[in-house]
Amino acid sequence: MAEAGVEILCVGTELLLGDILNGNARWIAERLAGLGLPHYRQTVVGDNRQRLAAAAREASGRCRVLITTGGLGPTPDDLTTESLAAAFETPLEERPELWDEIQANLSAGGRAVAPSNRRQAFLPRGAAVLPNPLGSAPGMIWSPLPDFTILTFPGVPSEMRAMFEATAEPWLRRHGGATGVFVSRLLRFSGIGESNLAEQVADLLEGVNPTVAPYASLGDVKLRLTACGSSAESAAALLDPVEAELRRRTAQHCYGTTDDSLASVVLALLQRSGQTLSVAESCTGGGLGAALTAVPGSSAVFAGGVIAYSNAVKQQLLDVPAELLERHGAVSDPVVAAMAEGARQRLGTDWSIAVSGIAGPGGGTDEKPVGLVHLAVSGPDGCEATAERFGDRRGRGAVQQLTVIRALDRLRRRLLAQS
């Protein structure tokens, strides 16, 4: 056998087409890491008997445990159980007690029992049932070869998770071949690109235990730190000095950890200082307010905002002088500064953020192209306005998202400077 450990095989044409994000694989991978189980490969196959069987046979030559999700339902395209049986040349057998349980579960849920549901009562000879407390699709645990075990779960996330926690985790703790306990942390960064961040921490990226790996998404860069130890405490002790060094080198670019968002960090800083916030939005159309109010408890410091899309609303609700709009245009430093000051005065807050830009795809000029955004942060120590150029290649939604991220980060840095 080339490798030990656990592999994940996710079944469903909808996954290959991108209709559904593969959240099951991510969730299982996190649980395997927490159990200290080596996990080196994930595979996705469509609803096809031959390819599914081939994937299972290939996995049997690499790993000790194969976890599958999907394809356990009653419809003709639910092929996992019969394909696995065919892959290892094992006959399917009906389990009368399982069929009785499936019928009882369907009836208890007020659902009609269809003849096709009977397919779910067939398992390969020698397989044991993994009960499904939330649905009609049972899984199985089956060892078709020496030192190779398959655990199957439905694709419905809530059903898969309940079954995994109740049945798979206890079994994996005993038989999975854990090599230690893995602990991971995520550090989040803003205002720095992935390549620049990687240069600053290049030597730490070469570490083996802990490992440090960069990940980038729109407007956000992350470093995942992972360590393996004999216990969670020993693994955490390996992470602590590396995290401290990363924070030292990156200074204010690091804004939080795994569960933090820029909005939650900004709100926490405001609450700590006993200050309040308002927003004035044009090109983001409420995106700033949405990001802030997505954080539970935001009402303690976030007073509200004005979506001032037209010049008339900028004048009427934010007291932006008409001559500023005529002289500089709505997308300009003077206008966003006036918007921020107007919101701060009208809503009676300590701080205010204002944004105005050209999100596209049309409306740009040579002087003010698509992707140009002006941001202003007004606070007790004055108002600062700046321009950002996000370009026109990413599209309207990306410009709006980047504007929200950059505006919140500007406020975060101002709040840190005052503390």
Swiss-Prot record:
InterPro entries: CinA (IPR050101), CinA-like_C (IPR036653), CinA_C (IPR008136), CinA_KH (IPR041424), Competence-induced_CinA (IPR008135), MoaB/Mog-like_dom_sf (IPR036425), MoaB/Mog_dom (IPR001453). Gene3D superfamilies: 3.30.70.2860, CinA-like (3.90.950.20), MoaB/Mog-like domain (3.40.980.10). It comes from the Bacteria. It holds the Pfam family MoCF_biosynth. Belongs to the CinA family. NCBIfam families: cinA_nterm, PncC_domain, PRK00549.1. This is CinA-like protein. It comes from Parasynechococcus marenigrum (strain WH8102).
